[in-house]
Amino acid sequence: MAEFQWPWEYTFPPFFTLQPHEETRQQQLKVWTDLFLKYLRHTNRFTLSIGDQNSPLFHNEALKRRLSPELVLAILGELERSGHANPLDKRRQEWQVYWFTLEEYGNMVYDWVQETGQTNTICTLYEIASGENTSHLDFYGVDEAVLLSALRLLEEKGRCELIEMDGSHGVKFF
């Protein structure tokens, strides 16, 4: 895997401190949310823990600067508002982060189903997330928990039905 390319802001010490001026803070949060999504996609991760203070995402060792838990929460809050994250616990310490929104994932999967003529067939989540027929698509490699959440949205719209089989999930598309 190629080395992650950090944006120039990552080497700018004030970037690691929540800015007091509203416009500056909004721009800072925009850059951080983009950085979170790009970094997590690059590292193929879908979960974050606020307590993981040694992660390069939270800590620039060369600058000896680290994000405060408050700033991490502010960034994750922005990601939540844009549909790219949800807390996994009530204390909001563990988060699931989506490279695309759940609706975007659902639409990508449904488009693939339509294009490949798989309506009225049953697919496993593994086939969708990791199968050789999807290896060229943006949702390839998606965490199955994220995929399941996206498929639940499709199910609410009447586009599919989730089926549980021996503790694993399948899905029938309409």
Curated annotation (Swiss-Prot):
Does the record's keyword annotation contain Membrane?
yes
GO MF term list: protein homodimerization activity; structural molecule activity
> Does Zinc appear among the keywords?
no
Write down the InterPro entries for this protein, in alphabetical order. ESCRT-II_cplx_Vps25-sub (IPR008570), ESCRT-II_cplx_Vps25-sub_N (IPR014041), WH-like_DNA-bd_sf (IPR036388), WH_DNA-bd_sf (IPR036390)
A Pfam family hit: ESCRT-II
**Localization annotation:** Cytoplasm; Endosome membrane
Q: State what the entry records as the consequence of deleting this gene.
A: Vps25 mutant cells exhibit multivesicular body sorting defects, with large amounts of ubiquitinated proteins detected on endosomes. This leads to activation of signals (through Notch and Dpp receptors) that drive cell proliferation, non-autonomous overgrowth, loss of epithelial organization, and render cells sensitive to apoptosis. Vps25 mutant cells display accumulation of autophagosomes. Bicoid mRNA is mislocalized in developing eggs.
GO BP term (any one):
ubiquitin-dependent protein catabolic process via the multivesicular body sorting pathway
- Name a GO CC annotation attached to this entry: ESCRT II complex
Primary localisation category: cytoplasm
Q: Which UniProt keywords apply?
A: Cytoplasm, Endosome, Membrane, Protein transport, Transport
Q: What does this protein do?
A: Component of the ESCRT-II complex (endosomal sorting complex required for transport II), which is required for multivesicular body (MVB) formation and sorting of endosomal cargo proteins into MVBs. The MVB pathway mediates delivery of transmembrane proteins into the lumen of the lysosome for degradation. The ESCRT-II complex is probably involved in the recruitment of the ESCRT-III complex. Seems to function as a tumor suppressor by regulating Notch trafficking, hence preventing non-autonomous overproliferation. May be involved in the regulation of autophagy.
| Quaternary structure note | Component of the endosomal sorting complex required for transport II (ESCRT-II). Interacts with Lsn/Snf8/Vps22.
Q: Which family does it belong to?
A: Belongs to the VPS25 family.
The record's listing under PANTHER family reads:
VACUOLAR PROTEIN SORTING-ASSOCIATED PROTEIN VPS25 (PTHR13149), VACUOLAR PROTEIN-SORTING-ASSOCIATED PROTEIN 25 (PTHR13149:SF0)
Protein name per UniProt = Vacuolar protein-sorting-associated protein 25
Q: What lineage does the source organism belong to? A: Eukaryota, Metazoa, Ecdysozoa, Arthropoda, Hexapoda
